[in-house]
């Protein structure tokens, strides 16, 4: 039995790449895709924090030139592949198509999982180092540490925290099951309840993945990312780009199930002794055809360039929620507005 999971971080990067406000323009995407063998560099302008506002008019306007850099794209290569022996499916209860589909599914799932982990690693590496206003949360190790008593507040508080860092636009939340559990409990307290806790997560888009893991003592982890600040570049090998056909080898550019990214494919056949493929069922295949299916892609997960992340906040904030004791329910805060009406509950009459 196979159960493909959700790969929310990967899907998020792909979605943001294709968005109208993407940091990756079509020209860069096209140039990068065909760049195998070359170094891809993106011209960027550094942050200048020394701008002076004067209070006296003058006939002389001073120079203040920007400084630029060439940001080098760092690639990671991902490869998968499998083989098929067509004759092995003659007089076989499992058809060629069924086995091919299952092999394609398991390898594609493994690739999606690896890419999702790569996307999360990019978020982890580029999370904010500074918070201009952390409210009343602990911020250590570049992570917001949320006490279990404040679990119901962090999804609402992440908006003003991001806004204080000058990121006021829509937020995406890349998170795990612990955060989904929290959202579902908040959803139970709507507009007709004592307190409308749905406002805590309203206006955000959630991207769920099992690859956002909790550290020891944590019950939920998420990355908050402002819309329009990330993207992903891909490139394929030169023969795939050329769609080469030679010596019974075929290269192409394809899209795999579950992964909306172009990858390079390589197909060829050979003839040889395939009798050991699946034991006794193929012992007669001493001279048979074998098919080879290979797929590869170079991937670079990008976050908006920041020349001084120790002073200027990145558009990503990581937060962790402390774990409750086992079988301890999530407690919703109760706000008593007329405490004075109860003995010992407020100011004396």
Located regions from the model:
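Ser/Thr- (and often Asn-) enriched beta-sheet segments in non-cytosolic proteins
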Residues: 39-41, 72-74, 79-81, 136-138, ...
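N-terminal "assembly arms/tails" that initiate or stabilize quaternary assembly
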Residues: 1-73, 216-217, 312-316, 320-349
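Sequence/fold signature of self-assembling virion shell proteins
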Residues: 3-4, 8, 146-149, 184-349
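Extended, solvent-exposed, turn-rich assembly/linker loops in the middle of proteins
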Residues: 129-205
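Alpha-helical scaffold segments that mediate packing/assembly in large oligomeric complexes
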Residues: 90-164, 320, 324-349
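Residues in well-ordered beta-strands of folded domains
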Residues: 43-45, 74, 83, 174, ...
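Short acidic, glycine/tyrosine-flanked loop/strand segments centered on an H-E-D-like triad
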Residues: 65-95
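A general structural signal for short secondary-structure junctions and capping/turn motifs
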Residues: 31-34, 162-166, 276-282
């Amino acid at each position: 039995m196979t159960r493909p999971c959700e790969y929310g971080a990967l899907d998020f990067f792909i979605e943001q790449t294709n968005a109208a406000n993407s940091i990756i323009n079509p020209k860069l995407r096209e140039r990068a895709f065909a760049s195998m063998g070359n170094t891809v560099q993106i011209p960027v302008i550094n942050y200048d924090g020394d701008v002076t506002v004067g209070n006296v008019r003058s006939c002389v306007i001073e120079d203040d030139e920007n400084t630029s850099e060439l940001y080098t794209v760092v690639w990671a290569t991902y490869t998968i592949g499998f083989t098929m022996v067509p004759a092995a499916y003659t007089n076989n209860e499992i058809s060629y198509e069924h086995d091919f589909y299952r092999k394609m599914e398991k390898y594609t799932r493994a690739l999606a999982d690896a890419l999702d982990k790569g996307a999360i690693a990019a978020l982890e590496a580029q999370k904010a180092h500074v918070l201009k206003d952390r409210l009343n949360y602990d911020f250590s190790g570049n992570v917001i540490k949320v006490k279990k008593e404040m679990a119901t507040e962090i999804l609402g508080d992440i908006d003003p925290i991001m806004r204080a860092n000058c990121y006021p636009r829509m937020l995406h939340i890349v998170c795990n099951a612990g955060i989904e559990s929290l959202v579902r409990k908040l959803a139970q307290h709507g507009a007709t309840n004592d307190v409308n806790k749905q406002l805590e997560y309203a206006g955000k888009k959630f991207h769920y993945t099992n690859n956002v893991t909790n550290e020891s003592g944590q019950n939920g982890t998420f990355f908050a990312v402002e819309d329009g600040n990330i993207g992903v570049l891909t490139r394929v090998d030169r023969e795939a780009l050329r769609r080469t056909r030679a010596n019974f080898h075929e290269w192409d550019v394809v899209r795999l199930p579950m992964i909306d990214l172009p990858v390079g494919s390589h197909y060829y056949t050979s003839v040889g002794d395939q009798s050991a493929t699946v034991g006794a069922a193929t012992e007669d295949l001493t001279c048979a055809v074998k098919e080879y299916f290979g797929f590869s892609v170079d991937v670079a997960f990008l976050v908006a360039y920041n020349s001084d992340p120790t002073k200027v906040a990145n558009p990503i904030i990581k937060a962790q929620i402390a774990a409750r004791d086992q079988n301890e329910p999530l407690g919703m805060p109760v706000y008593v507005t007329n405490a004075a009406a109860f003995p010992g509950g407020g100011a004396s009459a």
